[in-house]
Amino acid sequence: MNSQVSARKAGTLLLLMMSNLLFCQNVQTLPVCSGGDCQTPLPELFDRVVMLSHYIHTLYTDMFIEFDKQYVQDREFIAKAINDCPTSSLATPEDKEQAQKVPPEVLLNLILSLVHSWNDPLFQLITGLGGIHEAPDAIISRAKEIEEQNKRLLEGIEKIISQAYPEAKGNEIYLVWSQLPSLQGVDEESKDLAFYNNIRCLRRDSHKVDNYLKFLRCQIVHKNNC
């Protein structure tokens, strides 16, 4: 009896693992636009961008957990972390009620500003992680994967704006991550702290982007009927 239960549990776990693997492979290979001029219908384009943003947030979360497990040894280290993120100066909705008060074209440009702002910290993470003592390959590979998928996410968001709100193109705000020089610091703890803060902030922002895109898909594509 116990062996049958164990076999069923093992089978279920295997199916979940295969499902996750197929999902990741699908996201990695699915083009944001199916043609050079991107004639992908807006509902399908939203579906692809939402799937991609969720995948990126999952990668950020995995990377944060891995870094936390490898380098964060005590609460004292966490206490030193800066609460504010470089993008905190950007006024973004905190919940669905606030998001409903923001015009969709404005929210799309806020999303674009956040995603664009990830380019430099991602590059610095990939460059700097190689110099960290015993940096796990899993963290480095995830950072590289995020950098690649981030380009596709930017393309998808820009295509959505072009299709739905062409008059709003070019209205994004360009943000600079002021903490980046700390990633090149000499002191080992300072560098680890800078990496921790940046990965934490990237994860936080990716969660915002994921939620905003899901909200906008519901609002624009499904007319709030979801």
From Swiss-Prot:
This is Prolactin. Gene3D superfamilies: 1.20.1250.10. One of its GO terms (cellular component) is extracellular region. One of its GO terms (biological process) is positive regulation of vascular endothelial growth factor production. It comes from the Eukaryota. Its main location: secreted. It is found in: Secreted. The modification Phosphoserine is found at residues 53, 117. It comes from Rattus norvegicus (Rat). Belongs to the somatotropin/prolactin family. Prolactin acts primarily on the mammary gland by promoting lactation.
